[in-house]
Amino acid sequence: MSGTSLAKIRNIGITAHIDAGKTTTTERILYYTGVSHKIGEVHDGNTTTDYMEQERERGITITSAAVTCEWKDHRINIIDTPGHIDFNIEVNRSLRVLDGAVFIIEGVAGVQPQSETNWRLADRYNVPRIIFINKLDRTGADFYRAFDTLKEKLDIVALPLQLPIGIEDQFVGVVDLVEMKAIVWEGGELGAKFHDEEIPADMLEKAKEYRQNLLDTALSVDDAGMEEYFEKGDVATETLKRAIKTGTISGAFRPVLCGTAFKNKGVQPLLDAVLDYLPSPVDIEGIKVAPPEGEEEDPSANRRVIPANPDAPFAGLAFKIINDKYGTLTFVRVYAGTLRSGDTVLNTTKGHKERVGRMFQMHADKREEVKEVHAGDIAAFVGLKDTGTGDTLASSDDPVVLERMAFPVPVIDISVEPKTKEAVEKMTLALQKLAGEDPSLRLKTDQETGQTILSGMGELHLDIIIDRLRREYGVEANVGAPQVAYRETITREHTETYTHKKQSGGSGQFAEVKIIFEPQERNEGILFENKVVGGAVPKEYIPAVEKGIKVQADTGVLAGFPTVDFKYTLVDGKYHDVDSSALAFEIAAKACFREGMKKAGPVILEPIMDVEITTPQDHVGDVVGDLNRRRGMIQNQESSGSTVIVRAQVPLKEMFGYISNLRSMTKGRASFTMQFHHYDPVPRNIADEIMTKSA
């Protein structure tokens, strides 16, 4: 693949708050680029990218569908991502492998909570983005008000490239500020027909004012363009587009376009903007290699960068796994090199080789087989036996490990068991496959009850998993009520010595360990330090001590919840030449943990959620009073027209079934979103309640 064709690839994501119109916009893009001959509608349940049955029924996008399409001699790989917070893992994964993103903002509500969350994720990965203010045909739509929320809530330099002509049911087109013309859509033909005309006289002054702002902002990042402007009093369209692209890629500003995807207006100029302003794989630096295993991530560290070069050794990142009727599909973003069907690559994350079977370019759930893939491509591989999400695949000539992915902590548990004994093995295999696809889903067995416990990001997330278990794997399951994923930790330092001694004829068991337990900051995890000197505990037994603590930490001393955020330091111990063994030291470490933790100020932690409620003005009192009863801490309130946005932090335990309460309290007029924020110790009375129940 030549450099020119690499410059004609765009890997983009489409992301937004739930119901802002992502999937509808993607459907229009596929229609206008010729991939689909009929436009699918979310409310009809026949969209191309929402191809899982649950998505079509619920009208939301659950998994990131990868779709390839062509526009004006360019190839665009689009990832349509979910807007519901329970599926944030999908947004995280897709932003990680994209070169650019289109953020869709609702023209009535402006920036909503999930948009803010996704925006912060895109900031983390330095993804260049353009903004599309959608649904301008809706009653109550206001381009300028929605635009103001971009500056207020995202704290960005938002740069309009278009202004709407008309609003609500009078919306007919846009003023293009780059070329200073009006683009007006004609009726019929599903929005495929539009024409240019003069800017309406009543908008000309406003258009000139916004055009001047566009020139001042865009040319501030382009010295040659600024010189051209000073010489001629204006700049060529190509110069202005070049400056806008430079500022978009650097993040100096964020271009803003507008339209209504549902009414088929504004999508073609959006596609043009994707080509004009979002980067190709060669426009950006490339991907950094990961720091060595165990070394802290340091953003300022000067790590090697892998540029997009099809002639370099192969390097790619597996970012999604899907199990379907054809087997396991592993979605890979190719960063460097060329790979052919049948080639063998090295999984450098896990240290083993994988043979690539067939490779496909995906059009939602339809596929087109390809014989080779190159730097810049996104493709699905068949035949990989043990490659997980976030694993690097590389040539053995240059076995790099690419930047690793971080996955969120599940906050909600359910127990699940098959309705028949015969289905036990079938259910276990199915859940292992589902957990392999979704790193935010955790699977474990309760040691006391033998029950299978599923941990996920929210009730909807786990609902969908159970639904998929039934539909895709034919397993009917009994599901327990959702439970909060509590954790335990310690609040003070304590040193514990424990001796394990067992003599029952023949060789016995002996091991002694002295361990200091210390609390850590939230999210620091479990840290181990070995400070044994003089061989008091032989080196070969140190891993057994580590294993004992890690295994025992899964069952906390208060109520059996996993223990987190502590450091343990092995400082001394004793061994016996004959009776000591790895098993003896593992047993001693487990018992030392049980005894030591009881004396280190153990507490139970609960997940605290960020909750945002949008309610009519006349129900604010009821909503706030109800949140207070739920142990909520009100953060702030913000009026927006006739509605009020109430932001609070509330324990997850108090939020189960909240939607039905909110609906009855506000006669169905309020809505809310919620996402995990942090873990906090539970109040004493609730801790007692939890411990009594677990006993």
UniProtKB/Swiss-Prot annotation:
Domain of life of the source: Bacteria
Positions with a binding annotation for GTP: 16-23, 80-84, 134-137
Assigned keywords, A-Z: Cytoplasm, Elongation factor, GTP-binding, Nucleotide-binding, Protein biosynthesis
Designated name of the protein: Elongation factor G
A Pfam family matched in the record: GTP_EFTU
Entry's localization field: Cytoplasm
SMART domains (alphabetical): EFG_C (SM00838), EFG_IV (SM00889)
Domain tr-type G: 7-282
Source species: Acidiphilium cryptum (strain JF-5)
Disulfide bond positions: none
Family matches, as PANTHER family: RIBOSOME-RELEASING FACTOR 2, MITOCHONDRIAL, TRANSLATION ELONGATION FACTOR G-RELATED
GO cellular component: cytoplasm
Function: Catalyzes the GTP-dependent ribosomal translocation step during translation elongation. During this step, the ribosome changes from the pre-translocational (PRE) to the post-translocational (POST) state as the newly formed A-site-bound peptidyl-tRNA and P-site-bound deacylated tRNA move to the P and E sites, respectively. Catalyzes the coordinated movement of the two tRNA molecules, the mRNA and conformational changes in the ribosome.
InterPro entries with a match to the protein in the record: EFG_II, EFG_III, EFG_III/V, EFG_IV, EFG_V, EFG_V-like, EFTu-like_2, G_TR_CS
Keyword Disulfide bond: no
One GO process term, biological-process aspect: ribosome disassembly
Main location group: cytoplasm
Family: Belongs to the TRAFAC class translation factor GTPase superfamily. Classic translation factor GTPase family. EF-G/EF-2 subfamily.
One annotated GO molecular function: GTPase activity
